[in-house]
Amino acid sequence: MRIFDTSKREKVEFSPIKDGEVSIYLCGPTVYDDAHLGHAKSAVSFDLLRRVLKALGCKVKFARNYTDIDDKILNKMAQTGQSLEEITNKYIAHYESDMGALNVLDPDFKPKATQCLEAIISYIKVLMDRGVAYKTSDGIYFDTSKDSGYFSISGKDNNTDLIARVASFGEKRDEKDFVLWKFDEKWYESPFGKGRPGWHTECVAMIREFLSDKENDKFEIDIHAGGIDLLFPHHENEASQCRCAYHKNLSKYWMHNGFIKVNNEKMSKSLNNSFFVKDALKNVHGEVLRYYLLTSHYRAHFNYSDEDLVASKKRLDKIYRLKKRVDGVQAGMANESFKSELLEALSDDLNASKALASVDEFVKTANERLDNNPKDKAYKAEVVANLELIGEILGIAITNYVEYFQFGVSDEQKEHIQKLLDERAVAKKERNFARADEIRDELAKMNISIMDTPNGAVWERNNE
């Protein structure tokens, strides 16, 4: 498998530290608000990576953290009067619900910063003992001048605008220096004084706590992932701390997904063009949004448009219509050529768009073969297995097709539709075909189509 290693600025052959085992850390959200499309892009991109590695036979340990103590959360507390736990628990629950709707596999580890304070404090003590951290009136800071490898991950330099635009840095020795522990009497006890951890320190401590091989003094993990907006300074600062604390690299590979754009503008709250995943899920099934996110390469800047979302739904609908055709058939063996085609595309730095093109071709071919030979049980069994493979690797076409096609219909509406179908069944039994047709027309006006099967009528919501 080849992946793009941001720190190398090129595609490289992926070779895990321990053969057959892969450790991945994904920077998760700061939980002060609901998940937006950028969070979804990152989660889906590296969920795909995890699925592909598992399909290739690797045992994967996957961690995704929650930053649950941060200035933004404190601001939310001041605005709402709610406690830290009330705010963070609420948005963690919302985030997990949203990611579940996108078929993102639950991580093996979901550490929260506030649950790892002992590890964070111990880590800061190591940095202080190494002489690479210093104290000011407002906190403990990391001395970036002690790291000759600073900028090695991001490839930036001291002339970058991100550095130059800092006009004043108070008691810090250098504008690049960052806080490890922020003094604040309202928060947590530590040997340095009451306070709370700095963002850049939390992730390193959690990686060491949950993914590193501490028993054998092996700190390095295989892959550190996140959005490209985290590359500098966040990931640069993480890597720098690890080198200075343990004289070891934090991660062998660094992977980053691209920005989200909305109508060709970068999505951001300042531009008032960001939107929440929960709002998108009111209008489309979660798998549609996942499919749409997969149509663009994970490193590309993803440009959201309603038209492209609709196009993705139409492509996914075709997969579900095939699933409907083979409903009730026991899975056989997946076609090895098809499996190889999928994995070959995805092993090339997660080329999901190429993999989806292979899926499109499979669906087209399957429908043609079933049209020509609808009683071919062996082929139907192969189709079911291929569909299961698509679900396993790409995380789509997992839902029951009835549920998928009935998305967006309320329970109250479903009850009303079922009453009409029951009435229609009685009318047909009594050979009152005029009434049966009236009910079909009434349902059509509700944007509902019905199909008669040996087991009774089934219905679905049409595209509007």
Swiss-Prot record:
- Spell out the protein name for this chain: Cysteine--tRNA ligase
Q: Give its localization.
A: Cytoplasm
Which cysteine pairs are covalently linked by disulfides here?
Answer: none
GO CC, any one term: cytosol
Residues binding ATP are 269
Q: Subunit structure of this entry?
A: Monomer.
Q: Example GO molecular function term?
A: cysteine-tRNA ligase activity
The protein's gene is named cysS
Lineage, top-rank taxon, reads Bacteria
This enzyme catalyses: tRNA(Cys) + L-cysteine + ATP = L-cysteinyl-tRNA(Cys) + AMP + diphosphate
E.C. number: 6.1.1.16
Q: Where is this motif: 'KMSKS' region?
A: 266-270
Q: For this protein, what does the record note about how its cofactor is bound?
A: Binds 1 zinc ion per subunit.
Query: Where is the motif ('HIGH' region)?
Result: 29-39
Source organism of this protein record: Campylobacter concisus (strain 13826)
